[in-house]
């Protein structure tokens, strides 16, 4: 048997397995099709002022990205997009001026709002209406190098901790 032929045959047989392992194995159902009722908040209690409490964690999240407002069950306006350092400062300033303990959520806290059964974005659209499909900042830092921070991709709720901290992205706020 020719070794070159065996080598290339092994490569060709390995490629489909490798490519299949890179896919998202969840159901490709859009969350807007998966959730059919505004009445069932699916683990969240809606509060006044465009915020919602996650029942199992007790965390309170803004329902819209910073810069948007909840009007008639939809997020209106444009999300503020800042680099990581400016996003942290922006939320600290809101906390100081409002007297509320708002902060940018950690990557673990952000994962609390994402759903495993659906995508595009992977959130309940009745809890987080018309959320932009984008990377959202978290407050989580990468060990090294210092140039990177963690974000969560809203399309499928995946964490990415090699995001340049200089990239401007939307973000939510959370409080305990």
What are these language model-derived features?
Residues 1-11:
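Bacterial N-terminal signal peptides that target proteins for export
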Residues 10-18:
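Bacterial N-terminal signal peptides
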């Amino acid at each position: 048997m020719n070794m070159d032929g065996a080598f290339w045959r092994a490569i060709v047989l390995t490629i489909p397995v490798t490519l299949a392992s890179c896919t998202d194995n969840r159901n490709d159902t859009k969350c807007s099709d998966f959730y059919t009722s505004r009445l069932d908040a699916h683990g969240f209690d809606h509060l006044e002022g465009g915020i919602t409490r996650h029942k199992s964690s007790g965390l309170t999240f803004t329902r819209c990205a910073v810069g948007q407002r909840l009007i008639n069950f939809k997020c209106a306006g444009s999300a503020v997009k800042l680099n990581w350092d400016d996003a942290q400062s922006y939320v600290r300033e809101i906390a100081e001026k409002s007297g509320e303990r708002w902060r940018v959520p950690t990557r673990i806290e952000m994962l609390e709002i994402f759903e495993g059964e659906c995508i595009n974005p992977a959130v309940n659209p009745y809890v987080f209406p018309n959320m932009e499909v984008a990377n959202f900042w978290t407050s989580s830092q990468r060990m090294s190098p210092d140039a990177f921070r963690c974000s969560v991709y809203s399309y499928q709720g995946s964490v990415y901790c090699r995001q340049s901290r200089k990239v401007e992205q939307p973000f939510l706020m959370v409080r305990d």
